[in-house]
Amino acid sequence: MKINTWFGSLEVGSGGEILAFDLFPKGIRELALRSLSLRSSRENLPPEGFDLKAAALECGFVASLSEYYSLLHEVTLEAAKLQVSEAITPDQRIVQAVEALDDINETTNSLSERLFEWYGGYFPESGLVGEALALFIVKYGSRENVPPDDPLYLKARDSMGAKLETADEALLKGFAESVCSLYSRRKQLEAYIESSMEALAPNLTTIAGPMLGARLISIAGSLEKLAAFPSSTIQVIGANKALFKHLRARAPSPKHGVIYSHPFINTSPWWVRGKVARALAAKISLAARIDFYSATKDLSLMGELEEKVRKIRAANPKPPQKR
Amino acid sequence: MKINTWFGSLEVGSGGEILAFDLFPKGIRELALRSLSLRSSRENLPPEGFDLKAAALECGFVASLSEYYSLLHEVTLEAAKLQVSEAITPDQRIVQAVEALDDINETTNSLSERLFEWYGGYFPESGLVGEALALFIVKYGSRENVPPDDPLYLKARDSMGAKLETADEALLKGFAESVCSLYSRRKQLEAYIESSMEALAPNLTTIAGPMLGARLISIAGSLEKLAAFPSSTIQVIGANKALFKHLRARAPSPKHGVIYSHPFINTSPWWVRGKVARALAAKISLAARIDFYSATKDLSLMGELEEKVRKIRAANPKPPQKR
Amino acid sequence: MPDIKLLSEGIFEIMKDKRQLATLNLDPGKVVYGEKLISVEGAEYRTWDPRRSKLGAMVLKKFNIPLSKDSKVLYLGAASGTTVSHVSDIASEGAVYSVEFASRSMRDFIRLASRRKNIFPILADAGKPDSYAHIVEPVDLIFQDVAQPNQAEIAARNAARFLNKNGYLLLSIKARSIDTAASPKEIFKEEVKKLEQAFEPGFEILTARDLMPYHEDHLGVLAKLKE
Amino acid sequence: MPDIKLLSEGIFEIMKDKRQLATLNLDPGKVVYGEKLISVEGAEYRTWDPRRSKLGAMVLKKFNIPLSKDSKVLYLGAASGTTVSHVSDIASEGAVYSVEFASRSMRDFIRLASRRKNIFPILADAGKPDSYAHIVEPVDLIFQDVAQPNQAEIAARNAARFLNKNGYLLLSIKARSIDTAASPKEIFKEEVKKLEQAFEPGFEILTARDLMPYHEDHLGVLAKLKE
């Protein structure tokens, strides 16, 4: 019986005695690569309870147990490092970008609110929020610098806001610059996710849109896992809390998770949203599977979904009567 | 009897009849300023139940009730705006900076962690964190760009990290730039708080340090409120949760709030920290009062506190015996 | 078409999807704090969330609300104007003198006040009524929601100076702002006693009810001056 | 000088300020996950937090821990190595084959493994023992903490291939990872039954105790192969 080990191929007799062997060269990297290549082999496995280290000694692969362990330590370490270096697949890169985008969104909102509150003491009438406010502050600082041709000139001139001292103006401008930097980061991440999604999962991107598609992959963990989910799971991805409550306390089953943000659902009247969500989840599941297994674009998917949603809406023109 | 109203001074008889009057000019801003100047007058108040609008009609200040209300509306609005524009006092500006700094710290930490996690997939051996990591990524991007004269060259060359694609490198560099922007914002805010505190509250700054002093003002709401607190309150400022628990559920009284960060406390052995906190809080309270009421620097304060702390430590060289 | 019921002068209950408290919008088309606008036969109603307004909660707790379209009101503790806006809707031809101490809140309140002619903003300490005695006329109602430990005293001082003989006091007492440790029930008993006896002029309590479930540990009080 | 008590081979209880579980540090001066180092007469101990380690909790719940200094161990679910580091301390002259499926955890685990000669990292699915059959020798103990719904099956498969006739299985079962809805008690009963009967080879259960108060809804199990 032939068996494969990390240090070589052996021919073993029925009593476990070694009849012949073909040892690998002792290079760490080479041994690690061979070891990795053996991972998925279903044949020539050592029999249950086979003592690898005794065999390695017997064949003369190593001169001592301590050499055996020392070499195996280096080889397993190298193999693990090689695997780790290959772990960042295209869908994992999208997942990283989605997570980074979530962090950026959260911090941008929090710093934008602070800027609004802070600058509001100096020019509460500006009516500006978010990036527009940050850009305004970077440009002018104090409202005294707003020129007559700016649409906000009159409001700035007549503002009840306090006078902005030079030191505070520098502080606010710097703060606004950081906020602007975060807004451009947001755009950069969104653009990356859009183009990566189109390349990785064209069908999912068509059906769900790039951002929702990326979010689904991110919550599932990978495109492979998303493709493996039943569509009933996809329907409630991101509704963990509600789902947990449903399972534990027999609360009503949630109708939709993150797919709620899809325009087909949030533009539908409330009484058909559950049905639309079910149809959408089914199509997303199909799209993810095509993307994972064949990666070719199926041009008919979107038309089918639109038709299905149209039918659902047509069949349910009115809200159900309350009982 | 002479009485002051927002529209003029009146001479009123004992039956409430108007004997004479001196009306103000009808300019909105001028009336608003006069109205504000009457706020703190303790004399010549209208008697209880005095009907101002009837008097204004009677004196001919206005021709109709609707004119009365319309004018009063404009005047109260203008007065309130004037007050709001003066509300941002030097200590309020420090409070704003402290709040902005808190937000910046929180977001910087969260984005730094994300950067560490994300870049860790490409160069886990760098050993860099925080601003050093962000600066490294801005400088080099991929570890392939680390030159042989950089101390991290060997680690970069032999890293188990994945290969960093160009598109991801641009993303990571941009993200790192935003993080760097936040770190410089943090420094700018700290420098502002330090110099403002030295000017506003030199004694508090000497005793507590500028950052702790600013935080105490921020939690109290203003220097005036801080100066009005008893020192037992100052000792536990920022320990709200523990204090609330103490009041509600008879839990032990908290020994110190934010003043815990003071070097006199956190370098003291644990068994004298309560005593040191009490001494420190007393001196902080005194310093805040001097700053609020006289704003002159008292050079003896720090020496007295140091002496007091020295004595506390000398009197309690050993931990109390457990019973 | 939604079903509309009149609860008190200027205060409505509209049935649209669910029962909603509402007032007629004095500033048509404009929303103050994110509430909904509902148009019925040319009239525009603004919904009124009792969880965000002590007065709104008092309406639903069946307090008699002594407000009519020409009421003169002294409102103590205007904050950013959520409730004042509804009082302004109701007393559409009256006057709402609105006192608020925090300049940060006043900044927002000014935006509201500048759009409504019957609101008169006053940035002042409600505990010092002398400081606005040169502005405020005698009123029919004092509404007070100031979250100060000495709120009974504040009510008495303002009533002495500004409240008409037949006028009313509507008061919201927050247990926490009196004492964080004692039980709300004890606090309420104590505060009601203070209103009745501790200061000149004393009040006669007409109604006193907690504002559950809209506000926890809050007592609503309707009172008038002792004769 | 701290008081030291031997609880099991290589496992100590040190009294310093409070009782603390500890092992002798195989990598002196280095800390793995923020634990404390305590030096006593030239020997360096690493404290071991039972709240962060199922095995640590099992020690305190008085499980017999079948580990000695030359043990060969197959550790399934190495994560980032918190517990493996202590197993490596105890089996200082043995071998700890450490299987972990998540490459993110393996990234951190490699840092630990590279400093300790007796750790052999394996990035693989513990449910597929064939994939590391060419590496792992027969072992004296399988420790398993994988939080998979089919953990009984995983234990059986690995035991069949790698566990010595006289070897032991130490298993931590997390109720939530089997079923989020059922009661932990029911789940534990079911899982113990599966270990005994559902797969070849069956196990004989020696000890089964929950890991409270260190870990909620976790069952620790010590078992050996049926004869």
Curated annotation (Swiss-Prot), chains C, D:
Q: What is its EC number?
A: 2.1.1.-
**What GO MF terms are annotated?**
histone H2AQ104 methyltransferase activity; RNA binding; rRNA methyltransferase activity
Enzyme type, top EC level:
transferase
User: Would the keyword Transcription regulation be found if you checked this record's keyword annotation?
Assistant: no
A GO biological process of this protein is:
tRNA processing
* Binding-site positions, S-adenosyl-L-methionine: 82-83, 100-101, 125-126, 145-148
* Superkingdom of origin organism: Archaea
Please report a single Pfam family linked to this protein. Answer: Fibrillarin
Q: Decide whether keyword Ion transport is in the record.
A: no
Q: Tell me which UniProt keywords the record has, alphabetically.
A: Methyltransferase, RNA-binding, rRNA processing, Transferase, tRNA processing
Q: What family does the entry list? A: Belongs to the methyltransferase superfamily. Fibrillarin family.
| The protein's assembly and partners | Interacts with nop5. Component of box C/D small ribonucleoprotein (sRNP) particles that contain rpl7ae, FlpA and nop5, plus a guide RNA.
PANTHER family given in the database record: FIBRILLARIN, RRNA 2-O-METHYLTRANSFERASE FIBRILLARIN
Q: What is the role of the protein in this entry?
A: Involved in pre-rRNA and tRNA processing. Utilizes the methyl donor S-adenosyl-L-methionine to catalyze the site-specific 2'-hydroxyl methylation of ribose moieties in rRNA and tRNA. Site specificity is provided by a guide RNA that base pairs with the substrate. Methylation occurs at a characteristic distance from the sequence involved in base pairing with the guide RNA.
* Stated name of the protein: Fibrillarin-like rRNA/tRNA 2'-O-methyltransferase
**Gene source species:** Methanosarcina acetivorans (strain ATCC 35395 / DSM 2834 / JCM 12185 / C2A)
